[in-house]
A protein has these predicted regions:
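Short amphipathic alpha-helix segments
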Residues: 106-113
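Acidic, low-complexity, intrinsically disordered interaction modules
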Residues: 46, 67, 71-72, 97-100, ...
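Short intrinsically disordered terminal tails
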Residues: 1-2, 96-101, 151-158
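Short linear loop/turn motifs
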Residues: 74-79, 126-127, 158
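C-terminal alpha-helical interaction appendages
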Residues: 4-67, 71-101
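Generic recognition of long tandem-repeat/solenoid scaffolds
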Residues: 91-93, 104, 129-131
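Detector for the mature cores of small, proteolytically processed
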Residues: 32, 39, 44, 145-147, ...
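Short secondary-structure junctions
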Residues: 23, 119, 152-154
Length: 158
């Protein structure tokens, strides 16, 4: 999978500004990014799940208008965004990873993410939800039971 690495949030914002994707306009702030996207123990794995939303505004500055794809994945591990992984790069994956959006329509998602978001690694191009394999059988069974309601998604432990 192609990816682009950024040294900091400013470089990410410049990339998103220079490469206008889709038609949804975003204002971006690291704090707000952190609050709406999934966090992993490797940093922050950001997935846009706004397919059903016409416009989502995230404040970056008053005038920095940024267009990004609806279905994009951005892995952010940066001290400007989170204390996890200080000094690590920001990675934008291309092409967009499809399928992860289904999770955000799931009933009981909040409880699921409260317990398991730290072990979600990401989503691959085949709609496989990638989960850290270092889990007990009880947790794996709980994850499988939750995800099996969503036929579009399979779970792979890696």
């Amino acid at each position: 999978m192609k990816h682009i690495t950024f040294k900091n949030v400013d470089e990410l914002v410049k990339y998103l500004t220079d490469n206008h994707f889709g038609e949804t306009k975003f204002f971006v702030t690291p704090d707000y990014i952190k609050s709406i996207f999934g966090i992993t123990d490797n940093g922050i794995l950001l997935y846009s799940y706004t397919d059903m939303v016409e416009e989502l505004y995230l404040e970056y500055t008053e005038n920095d208008e940024i267009e990004v794809p609806y279905t994009s994945a951005i892995e952010v591990i940066d001290s400007n965004v989170t204390d996890v992984g200080k000094g690590s790069p920001i990675v934008v994956y291309e092409p967009p990873i499809e399928g992860y959006n289904y999770l955000f329509e799931c009933e009981g998602l909040d409880e699921f993410l409260d317990k398991y978001e730290s072990v979600i690694i990401g989503m691959d191009s085949h709609d496989n939800l990638l989960i850290d394999d270092d889990l007990c059988d009880e947790d794996k069974n709980a994850i499988n039971a939750f995800i099996e309601n969503y036929k579009e998604i399979d779970v792979l432990y890696v």
